[in-house]
Curated annotation (Swiss-Prot):
Gene Ontology CC annotations of this record: nucleoplasm; nucleus
Zinc finger (C2H2-type): 251-273, 279-301, 307-329, 335-357
The gene coding this protein: ZNF24
Lineage: Eukaryota, Metazoa, Chordata, Craniata, Vertebrata
Principal location class: nucleus
Stated name of the protein: Zinc finger protein 24
Region ranges (Necessary and sufficient for nuclear localization): 251-301
Length: 368
């Protein structure tokens, strides 16, 4: 049975009040003897991600009463965290990982989840690897631009692999292009869209998607304006964007029958079923789904720090670490709170700051 089909119709909760054990059973396909429902061993359970989603999406209306609701939530949580097989530290990492992925932008959530990280450190490595791919100063501009395009296509393919309706793919592609543009750019400019040396931001490097997800077949911009996004500023001018013709989906998954327009999307999708991680570390045996992630991981063993700050000479193993460090020298604070206007150099600091606003709102609600 595929992970997708299990997710859609796999869990049968038995909430009868007089039962001594409130357990969750997994619905299996009918076996040769005609038996349909049975509990299954831990090593044959579906992906814990399925139970995590069920745990988070569970509603009070799904149970006959409060006692049954707590019992069902407890069972779903147990099937997600699996205390019978995981240590306390592993369970803690799973909870931290879930929260970390939840606070990411939607397009990055998809990217991270496709790599199936087992803890927060692996999730960070996935994102740092993406950022390095998008912003390698040692490569020609044309090659870096092409890398961004390929990665955007790859990320859109992953949305396809997870069953996103084709009508929404253009909107997702726009989100991803903005995200890749923000990750790639380190240019500073004024209100005229000029860089620090007075030159206009190159028009040919503008991303092809703008402002809204509701982009028509042809997009015309009127009077030039300044559009600021994250760390980048540039003048908006008149240009057109035409949709690509719909692509024929000719790659089929043998497990669940889903169709994909690109072979790479099918390969990524099939890892959902297989859990394949073909790239293993010879030092510690840890396996990864992508060779680029393995390269990043190996720096833990080698101590390699190829990214060096030209200001002070400090070196970093990840390009994202260098980018964050350089803000100490530049004083750059690209992360701004929309509620009060306060700016921060690190997104994590902005997140903590915004939690304070949320707490204040909650207190106001309680007082009322």
């Amino acid at each position: 049975m595929s992970a997708q089909s299990v997710e859609e119709d796999s869990i049968l909760i038995i909430p009868t009040p007089d039962e001594e054990e409130k357990i969750l059973r997994v619905k299996l396909e009918e076996d040769p003897d005609g038996e349909e429902g049975s509990s299954i061993p831990w090593n044959h359970l579906p992906d814990p991600e399925i139970f995590r989603q069920r745990f988070r999406q569970f509603g009070y209306q799904d149970s006959p009463g409060p006692r049954e609701a707590v019992s069902q939530l407890r069972e779903l949580c147990r099937l997600w965290l699996r205390p019978e097989t995981h240590t306390k530290e592993q369970i803690l990492e799973l909870v931290v990982l879930e929260q970390f992925v939840a606070i990411l932008p939607k397009e990055l959530q998809t990217w991270v989840r496709d790599h199936h990280p087992e803890n927060g450190e692996e999730a960070v490595t996935v994102l740092e690897d993406l950022e390095s791919e998008l912003d390698d100063p040692g490569q020609p501009v044309s090659l870096r631009r092409r890398k961004r395009e390929v990665l955007v296509e790859d990320m859109v393919s992953q949305e396809e692999a997870q069953g996103l309706p084709s009508s929404e793919l253009d909107a997702v592609e726009n989100q991803l292009k903005w995200a890749s543009w923000e990750l790639h750019s380190l240019r500073h400019c004024d209100d005229d869209g000029r860089t620090e040396n007075g030159a206009l931001a190159p028009k040919q490097e503008l991303p092809s998607a703008v402002e809204s997800h509701e982009v028509p077949g042809t997009l015309n911009m009127g009077v030039p304006q300044i559009f600021k996004y994250g760390e980048t500023c540039f003048p908006k001018g008149r240009f057109e964007r035409k949709r690509n013709p719909s692509r024929k989906k000719q790659h089929i998954c043998d497990e669940c029958g889903k169709h994909f327009s690109q072979g790479s999307a099918l390969i990524l999708h099939q890892r959902i079923h297989s859990g394949e991680k073909p790239y293993g570390c010879v030092e510690c045996g840890k396996a990864f789904s992508r060779s680029s992630i393995l390269v990043q991981h190996q720096r833990v063993h080698t101590g390699e720090k190829p990214y060096k700050c030209l200001e002070c000479g400090k070196a970093f193993s990840q390009n994202s670490g260098l980018i964050n460090h350089q803000r100490i020298h530049t004083g750059e604070k690209p992360y701004e709170c929309v509620q009060c206007g306060k700016s921060y150099s690190q997104s994590s600091n902005l997140f903590r700051h915004q939690r304070r606003h949320n707490a204040e709102k909650l207190l106001n609600v309680v007082k009322v």
